[in-house]
Amino acid sequence: MNNKFQNIDEITSADVQKESLFKKTVFSIFFIWTYQYIHINYLCEVWSYMRYFKNELDFSQVFLTYIVALFPIYFYSGLKQISSYFSIIIYIMCYVPIVVTLSYNNTDELGYNTVLLHQVVLAFSMSFFFLVDKIKTIKSKRLILNIPIFWFHVFTILTTLYLVYKFSGNMRFVGFEDIYDLRSENSQFSDPISQYLTMWATYLIYPIYFSLGLVKRQKMYLLIGILGHIMIYMISGAKASILMPVIIFLIYIVVTKIKYLSFSQSLAFFVSSLSLLLFKVDVDSLFLFRSIFLMRTLSMPGYLFSNYLSFFSNHPYTQYSHIGIVNSFTNSYPYGDIPIGVVIGDYDMTNANANANFWATDGV
């Protein structure tokens, strides 16, 4: 096996050729409509007690919501660099849910002009993510081509050992009804380093191993990815950690089987189709998976951003003092010893640690 990561241009040149203005528009609108439909007909009906609202919007407000949600995709030009994978996933799994949720959750409370202003700022931010892929310097390319996978293995081993060292006394399997107890118990063992490493392990390290296992047909990589996600679940009770290998596998099947679609089109089609299928097939056996995927995974970025925006509309801003290193210099964190995620969790009455995406925690 090649001991270095391959040049991303050699792998994804065909993907760029599959991108077109028409396909971008059609698949993006399909996904935006799907999420709007799920928000109105599932989230607001089943989970309304968790601050999922259905504000009445007129045609112009709905139209502008679609325009803002659609705008950044025209700056996406296919898989050109490794960052392209992350940017399109952020667009589908984070950006669109945030834009749609803000319109339906916050318009009555904050006024549509305030909501639209935040949506426009997010649109430019997402567009910039896509534009970054076009910035390609000789220095950055050499860096990509000369990072041996050996050092990635070393980083993985050190991360795993540190997490096991920190939480080995309380790592265990729990049912979904007990995950908040597990999180509460393990919060006393956590520190800023373990919190960051847990996020990296959940959304980067072990997904990369599982993905490499699929692409290279390496059983060892698949095993590392699966065991890593199981370990994270035993530490944090994160449902996303258990669901991640399943989602990656399904995306892999869709991308490899639908040859005439690009990665972005396949991902939008897959997420939309799975969402509609889970909603329409109303059987009790799917209730858990439906809630995990539609509510806990797909809607959570928008839900949390909406709650952060609502909370900070009438509470003091942290001015980045929620970041431990910053607060060690400024000592200005306004909520005492309570982490910002817990503060928001108390506000939205879930009594959970509402850690959110960077747009919410560092943007709002």
Name each region found by the language model.
Residues 27, 83, 87, 225, ...:
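Alpha-helical protein-protein interaction elements
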Residues 236-298:
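Loop-centered beta-sheet repeat module
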Residues 102-115, 227-252, 363-364:
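Helix-loop-helix junctions and helix-breaking kinks within/between transmembrane helices
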Residues 8-22, 38-56, 177-196, 275-364:
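Small-residue-enriched transmembrane helix-hairpin modules in multi-pass membrane proteins
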Residues 1-210, 214-219, 256-263, 268-280:
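Membrane-anchoring hydrophobic segments
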Residues 199-248:
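Long, hydrophobic/aromatic-enriched structural stretches that serve as scaffold segments
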Residues 125, 223, 244-248, 255-256, ...:
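Generic detector of ordered, mature protein regions
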